[in-house]
Regions:
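Catalytic core of carbohydrate-active enzymes
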Residues: 156
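Protein kinase glycine-rich loop
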Residues: 42-53
Length: 283
C-alpha cells in the first residue's frame, strides 16, 4: 500500500468527490486533522466499538472521516477493508475518497521510565451523507414512508449487493446500520470491515465468520468452511432480513445484546418470521 500522500490538499478532496471516476488517494494525517479541527468533539458524528466518525469540512463539501480505535489496529483487517474499497465504484456503494496509514514514534511512560513506542493512526475518508443510516427510517419514518421510497431503497440495496458479488466481494455484515441514505433516499452500502475480496481466488477458504446477530444466516454458526461459492449466500440471507424490516417498519428483535444463546436467538426469529406477513404495511 502506497502511503505517499504529502501533496494532497482539501481542494483535491473536493475534486475527487466531484469526479465520479477519480480513484481514492493516500491522505496525510495532517490534512485529516485540519478538516476535522483536530478530531474535535464538535466534529464527532458517530462512534462504535472499532472507530469514531468525524465530519470533515472542505470549502464547499463535507466528508466523513472514520478513525480506527487502538483496539482495531489489525493491519490485515485494515488493508483488507481498503483493498475492497479501492475496487468498487457504484451509485449504491458509499463513495470512498481515501485512506491514511500513519505510524510515528512517540515517547511513552512504561514501568517508571520512558520508551519509544510506535503510534498507529488508521483512517478512512468517505463522502458524507446527512440523512444517516437506514436504521432510524425502519424504526421511525418507514411506517409513513411511501411505497415508492421503500421500493427505491430495497432496489438500490439489491443493486449494490449484486455489484459487490460481481466483483467477487462478500460484505458479511449487511444490516440497516450499514446502509446510508443520501438526500434523495438513495441507499449506499457502507462498512466493509468484515468483507472478503475473493477476486480470482474463489477457492480461498474463510474459516472465521463474524457479523451481527439478527442478520447472520444459521449456517454461520456451524463452523463449516466458507468459500466464495457459498459465502455470498450469507449476504442474501442478511438482505432478506433487511427487506422484511423495511416492509414491516420494525425489527425482528428488540434487544439483541441480551441474546445469550443461539437457541433463544433462533426462537425469537422463528416467531418473527411466522408473523411478519401480517405486519407488512398496506400499500
Amino acid at each position: 500500500m502506497d502511503h505517499r500522500s504529502s501533496i494532497i490538499t482539501p481542494g483535491d478532496l473536493e475534486r475527487i468527490l466531484c469526479d465520479g471516476t477519480a480513484d481514492p488517494k493516500a491522505l496525510p494525517l495532517s490534512l485529516l486533522e485540519k478538516i476535522t479541527d483536530g478530531f474535535s468533539d464538535e466534529h464527532q458524528i458517530g462512534s462504535g466499538g472499532f472507530a469514531v466518525v468525524y465530519k470533515g469540512k472542505l470549502e464547499t463539501r463535507t466528508v466523513a472521516v472514520k478513525r480506527m480505535s487502538d483496539a482495531y489496529m489489525d493491519e490485515k483487517v485494515f488493508h483488507r477493508e481498503v483493498e475492497c474499497l479501492m475496487m468498487i465504484k457504484h451509485k449504491n456503494i458509499i463513495r470512498f475518497v481515501g485512506y491514511c496509514a500513519n505510524t510515528q514514534g512517540s515517547m511513552e511512560r512504561y514501568d517508571k521510565k520512558f520508551v519509544m513506542a510506535d503510534v498507529h493512526q488508521r483512517l478512512l475518508c468517505f463522502e458524507y451523507l446527512s440523512k444517516g443510516s437506514l436504521d432510524k427510517y425502519i424504526t421511525d419514518i418507514s411506517r409513513g414512508l411511501q411505497w415508492r421510497y421503500r421500493y427505491q431503497i430495497i432496489t438500490g440495496i439489491c443493486q449494490g449487493l449484486h455489484y459487490l458479488h460481481q466483483k467477487k466481494i462478500v460484505h458479511l455484515d449487511l444490516k440497516p446500520a450499514n446502509i446510508l441514505l443520501d438526500d434523495y433516499l438513495v441507499p449506499k452500502i457502507t462498512d466493509f470491515g468484515l468483507s472478503r475480496c475473493f477476486g480470482e481466488m474463489q477457492s480461498r477458504v474463510v474459516t472465521k465468520i463474524a457479523g451481527t446477530f439478527g442478520y447472520l444466516a444459521p449456517e454461520s454458526f456451524n463452523n463449516t468452511e466458507v468459500t466464495y461459492r457459498n459465502s455470498y449466500r450469507l449476504d442474501i440471507y442478511s438482505l432478506g432480513v433487511v427487506i422484511i424490516e423495511i416492509l414491516t417498519g420494525e425489527k425482528g428483535y428488540h434487544d439483541v445484546d441480551n441474546v445469550r444463546t443461539f437457541s433463544v436467538f433462533f426462537q425469537t426469529y422463528a416467531i418473527f418470521f411466522s408473523h411478519f406477513r401480517s405486519k407488512i404495511i398496506s400499500l
